[in-house]
């Protein structure tokens, strides 16, 4: 998979089959769209392409919301690479970009920059300034500028449509089992092991302290969890405790893992 950090850097040699979105979580609903994207690209001898954005648009447009995300940008990139995608564009999202009208976005980005043959979108996709345009507008622009449009229905689990918001809420509520079902894989954290107070060692339960660098990563609620971890490419099991530790300046989040038989 080729990675580009702006659509201006992408120089397509072939026509592209494109999908657009934030893809937070890369959940089973996203996978349904991506599978269709890759299938279409193969059938039409085109390149498959995802256009996503960072920061998340809500971080820019709703600064007070402090949204927490299911994936860091590195985690999302790894998950998308596993799908077999040809190209990933992570375009910087800012207020100037958000002011593009729907037609400006279609003409200047999809047509002129991405050399689009077809766009595949989810059931609730909206775009353009203030997210005013929808599938009907996209079909009209497709007819005007010469590309195809296909909309994918929602992926459902037990008659409930899967969304990143529902997964975030499940994690916040402590329902990791439901979140994992919607994701299609176990929810995970990535970080750096740092030296802690080493109190666990004194009672026979040495722990590793995990530091999460990105403050926008959604951390499950405080509690004890069974975890699988990859250490030096080895899969090990353990118990993870998430809680608050007293510090000089108050309290800080602590993520400690006791690895079993390691």
Specify the residue positions occupied by each region the protein language model found.
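Short acidic-hydrophobic, aromatic-tinged amphipathic segments that line or gate anion-handling sites
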Residues: 2-8, 89
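Glycine-rich, highly charged phosphate/nucleotide-binding loops
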Residues: 68-76, 99-106
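Residue-level signal for inorganic ion chemistry
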Residues: 27, 80, 119, 179, ...
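Classical nucleotidyltransferase
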Residues: 99-206, 232
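A glycine-rich helix N-cap at a beta->alpha junction
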Residues: 75-88
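N-terminal catalytic cores of NTP/NDP-binding nucleotidyl/phosphoryl-transfer enzymes
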Residues: 7-72
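Phosphate/ribose-recognition catalytic cores of enzymes acting on nucleotide-derived substrates
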Residues: 196-262
């Amino acid at each position: 998979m080729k990675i580009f950090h702006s659509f201006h850097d992408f120089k397509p040699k072939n026509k592209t089959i494109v999908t657009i979105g934030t893809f937070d979580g890369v959940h089973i609903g996203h996978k349904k769209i991506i599978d269709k994207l890759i299938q279409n690209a193969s059938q039409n001898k085109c390149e498959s392409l995802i256009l996503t954005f960072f920061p998340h648009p809500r971080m820019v447009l709703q600064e007070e919301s402090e949204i927490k995300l299911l994936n860091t940008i590195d985690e999302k990139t790894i998950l998308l690479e596993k799908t077999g995608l040809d190209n990933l564009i992570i375009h910087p999202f800012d207020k100037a970009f958000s002011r593009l009208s729907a037609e400006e976005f279609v003409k200047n980005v999809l047509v002129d920059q991405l050399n689009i043959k077809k766009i595949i979108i989810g059931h609730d996709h909206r775009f353009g300034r203030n997210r005013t345009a929808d599938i009907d507008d996209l079909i009209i622009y497709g007819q005007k500028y010469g590309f195809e449009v296909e909309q994918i229905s929602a992926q459902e689990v037990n008659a409930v449509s899967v969304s990143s918001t529902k997964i975030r809420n499940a994690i916040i509520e402590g329902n990791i089992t439901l979140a994992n079902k919607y994701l299609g894989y176990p929810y995970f954290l990535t970080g750096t092991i740092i030296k802690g107070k080493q109190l666990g060692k004194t009672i026979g339960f040495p722990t590793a302290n995990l530091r999460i660098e990105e403050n926008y990563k959604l951390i499950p609620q405080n509690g004890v969890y069974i975890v699988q971890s990859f250490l030096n490419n080895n899969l090990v099991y353990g118990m993870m405790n998430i809680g608050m530790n007293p510090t000089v300046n108050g309290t800080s989040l602590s993520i400690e893992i006791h690895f079993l038989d390691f």
